[in-house]
């Protein structure tokens, strides 16, 4: 504590030289307006004198050179760690942080004016912005014991108000004797004088002299605790706290950003100083906490100052201790080229199989590299990977998403059937106290630089259009209540959906199974389809896995080791023959990997955060990896070449590059290798196969969008009926049918199969080697209509 005793090591003992005292007396009203006069023997004055001596030393010249000039507002960023060895300063900051910071500002004011040959009145008040202050405190621990203390909290900006002027000081004039009274408003709380202090005048009426008002910029923000923190508690509403920003701190953050706020904890009672009646007796003893911000640090400030970690897409001030860095180094050295398999099986080990699906989600967690994110002259290219898992109920899709949100350094999990459009993107809310409109961030904005997991994706068809911009342009534009803005939403989207009707129908396209537009589906880099196929061998091994998961005898033979004894099934039972290379390499062997132990969640989160923050792989041109990706893309274009257009576009090539960069990030490499490209091609092939295969097992790239064969058959039969009425005949040759299919742009790979299916259904009848009669034509007077499905 800063007491009345002499300072140890302080030059000059208790005395204060006349020059310092005169200088402090001149600037004192600027920093302590509530004090009527400068007291040289006061605690704050002696602290300021000590700080003048400290900052006058040559070691402090570098610190004072950092004074920032933002118009008429001056500020000095001070690293707390540089002052931590000075006990008397840390004790003063702990006992009365407001007084200590103001005294420090007054001392810096004197030194800056002396070093720049300026008069004390030539510059305005200097604000001390203390950062890097001790360990952050969780919002749940912020209670009454911290009132008037200096603390540091971290969270996501949930809401930002408009900037308004706050009155700090105002003169009032008595209506009776015309005497003027200066009035200082502590903490901005407006409190006019009660009665005139002049002898003999008892007037209670005063006129505010608005021209004498001393103002400063004021803004409120609300921050929410980080959902993926290790101290996060499930089953409760995330805690929030309001922070007051003043002067140079206003407009330093936007909704969705992760910020570290250092400030003083204060209390406020909404019913204080309010006239009688019910409001005076209601909740009179209840207060709520808020922060008076001293400094705000966020990724935008770091990126603007040239910090490469922020520019590379870090997860917002993830701290790495020496033990963390040592673990990452040893983990990479121990597993070598097997890191990907180790991380993949550490992710959601309770789900059996689905290695390639887990591989795709793992790559989405690491993400690619965003290009041109800072250069204003170039269009940014997203590096986040989007994936959707479609399949029958009960295959573990929701567990995969919850596991992804849990291990992500910044992950948000939402359910589609309880999510609104505004809750997913951004809402405009009205402040009850100021009647102003402000933005309130939704899930996509809160997950900025992270991952957003959306379950029950098929239940939110009305909100699909809101995701189109957020998934490709990585931002959310809003124009509501007279507010027009664009908020960052640089997030990976992981979605899980059940098909319409509860069971995936191979005869329908992915769009028809999900009721999803082709524009939204094309934005997903990976589309995985999980089918519940009856398989005696697979069912036996899945049941063994589930029983092993639930049977823990309490001995060293834990459930985790018991799971390893379950033999992994052959890929041909799930994925088909001929596509087993990557899946077989990723699969755990029951004998070789019997001692496998998954990586704990906190360590996996640290590894992912480090990779995303410090590893920025690139793909060189020319290189074997680039040539391999380009060749695969060109082969896809050739295979999907058709007259009605193709779903294989440049987006697939960009997806391949993003996946290859993510694969290199897993191994902490700065260069994409040929092996990375091969593994990514295997994953992309699996995704395309699932998306484009039909009910007969035939791969048709046009089936990723558009209509299924059933709807194409309906369209073709309708055209045949129209031709019967126009040409007054009901028999057509195959050549005429081919010409008709071309005219109506029928999107089928095999017209003969369509004709054969219509013949088998009885809608057309074969009359010769290549002649067919239309049975449902109105030309024959038939009243039959197309009613079959």
From Swiss-Prot:
It comes from Oryza sativa subsp. japonica (Rice). InterPro entries: AAA+_ATPase (IPR003593), MCM (IPR031327), MCM8/REC_WHD (IPR056875), MCM_CS (IPR018525), MCM_dom (IPR001208), MCM_lid (IPR041562), MCM_OB (IPR033762), NA-bd_OB-fold (IPR012340). The keyword DNA repair applies. Its EC number is 3.6.4.12. This is Probable DNA helicase MCM8. GO terms for molecular function: ATP binding; ATP hydrolysis activity; helicase activity; single-stranded DNA binding; zinc ion binding. GO terms for cellular component: MCM complex; nucleus. Probable DNA helicase that may play a role in DNA repair during meiosis. A zinc finger (C4-type) spans 174-201. A motif (Arginine finger) lies at residues 522-525.
């Amino acid at each position: 504590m800063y007491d009345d005793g002499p300072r140890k090591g302080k030059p000059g003992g208790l005395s204060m030289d006349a020059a310092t005292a005169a200088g402090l007396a001149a600037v004192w009203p600027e920093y302590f307006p509530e004090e009527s006069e400068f007291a040289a023997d006061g605690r704050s004055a002696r602290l300021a004198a000590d700080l003048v001596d400290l900052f006058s030393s040559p070691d402090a010249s570098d610190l004072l050179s950092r004074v920032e000039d933002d118009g008429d507002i001056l500020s000095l960023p001070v690293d707390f760690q540089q002052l931590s060895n000075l006990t008397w300063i840390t004790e003063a900051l702990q006992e009365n942080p407001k007084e200590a910071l103001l005294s420090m500002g007054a001392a810096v004011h004197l030194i800056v004016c002396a070093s720049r040959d300026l008069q004390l009145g030539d510059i305005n008040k200097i604000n001390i912005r203390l950062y890097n202050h001790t360990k952050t405190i969780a919002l749940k621990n912020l209670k009454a014991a911290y009132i008037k203390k200096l603390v540091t909290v971290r969270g996501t900006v949930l809401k930002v108000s408009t900037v308004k002027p706050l009155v700090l000081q105002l003169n009032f004039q008595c209506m009776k004797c015309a005497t003027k009274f200066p009035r200082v408003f502590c903490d901005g709380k407006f409190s006019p004088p009660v009665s005139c202090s002049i002898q003999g005048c008892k007037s209670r009426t005063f006129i505010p002299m608005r021209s004498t008002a001393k103002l400063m910029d004021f803004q409120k923000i609300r921050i929410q605790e980080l959902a993926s923190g290790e101290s996060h508690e499930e089953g409760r509403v995330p805690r929030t706290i309001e922070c007051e920003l003043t002067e140079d701190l206003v407009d330093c953050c936007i909704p969705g950003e992760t910020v570290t706020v250092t400030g003083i904890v204060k209390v406020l009672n909404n019913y204080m100083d309010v006239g009688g009646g019910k409001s005076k007796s209601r909740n009179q003893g209840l207060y709520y906490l808020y922060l008076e911000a001293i400094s705000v640090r966020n990724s935008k400030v770091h990126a603007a100052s040239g910090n490469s970690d922020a520019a590379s897409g870090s997860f917002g001030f993830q701290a790495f201790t020496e033990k963390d860095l040592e673990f990452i180094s040893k983990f990479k050295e121990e597993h070598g080229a097997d890191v990907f398999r180790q991380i993949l099986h550490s992710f959601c080990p309770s789900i059996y199989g689905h290695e390639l699906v887990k591989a795709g989600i793992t790559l989405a967690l690491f993400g690619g590299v965003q290009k041109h994110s800072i250069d204003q002259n170039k269009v940014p290219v997203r590096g986040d990977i989007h994936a959707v898992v479609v399949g029958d109920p009960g295959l573990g899709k929701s567990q995969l998403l919850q596991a992804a949100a849990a291990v992500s350094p910044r992950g948000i999990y939402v359910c589609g059937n309880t999510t609104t459009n505004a809750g997913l993107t951004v809402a405009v809310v009205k402040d009850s106290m100021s009647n102003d409109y402000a933005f309130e961030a939704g899930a996509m904005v809160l997950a900025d630089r992270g991952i957003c997991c959306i379950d029950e994706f098929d239940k939110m068809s009305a909100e699909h259009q809101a995701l189109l911009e957020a998934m490709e342009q990585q931002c959310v534009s809003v124009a509501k209540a007279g507010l027009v803005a664009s908020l960052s939403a640089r997030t990976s989207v992981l979605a899980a959906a059940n098909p319409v009707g509860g069971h995936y129908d191979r005869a329908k396209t992915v769009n028809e199974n999900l009721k999803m537009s082709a524009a939204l589906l094309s934005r997903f880099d990976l589309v995985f389809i999980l089918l519940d196929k009856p398989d005696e061998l697979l069912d036996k091994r899945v049941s063994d896995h589930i029983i092993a998961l639930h049977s823990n005898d309490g001995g060293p033979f834990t459930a985790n080791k018991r799971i390893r004894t379950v033999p992994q099934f052959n890929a041909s039972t799930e994925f088909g023959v001929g596509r087993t290379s990557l899946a077989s390499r990723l699969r755990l062997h029951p004998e070789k990997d019997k001692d496998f132990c998954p990586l704990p969640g906190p360590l996996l989160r640290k590894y992912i955060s480090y990779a995303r923050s410090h590893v920025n792989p690139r793909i060189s041109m020319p290189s074997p990896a680039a040539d391999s990706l380009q060749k695969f893309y060109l082969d896809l274009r050739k295979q999907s070449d058709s007259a009605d257009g193709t779903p294989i576009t440049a987006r697939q090539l960009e997806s391949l590059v993003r996946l290859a960069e993510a694969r290199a990030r897993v191994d902490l490499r700065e260069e994409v290798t040929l092996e990375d490209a091969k593994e990514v091609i295997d994953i992309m092939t699996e995704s395309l196969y699932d998306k484009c295969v039909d009910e007969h097992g035939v791969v048709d790239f046009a089936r990723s969008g558009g209509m299924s064969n059933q709807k194409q058959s309906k369209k073709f039969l309708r055209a045949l009926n129209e031709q019967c009425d126009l040409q007054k005949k009901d028999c057509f040759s195959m050549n005429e049918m081919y010409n008709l299919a071309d005219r109506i742009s029928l999107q089928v790979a095999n017209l003969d199969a369509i004709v054969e299916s219509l013949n088998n259904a009885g809608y057309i009848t074969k009359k010769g080697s290549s002649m067919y009669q239309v049975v449902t034509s109105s030309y024959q007077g038939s009243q039959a209509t197309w009613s079959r499905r």
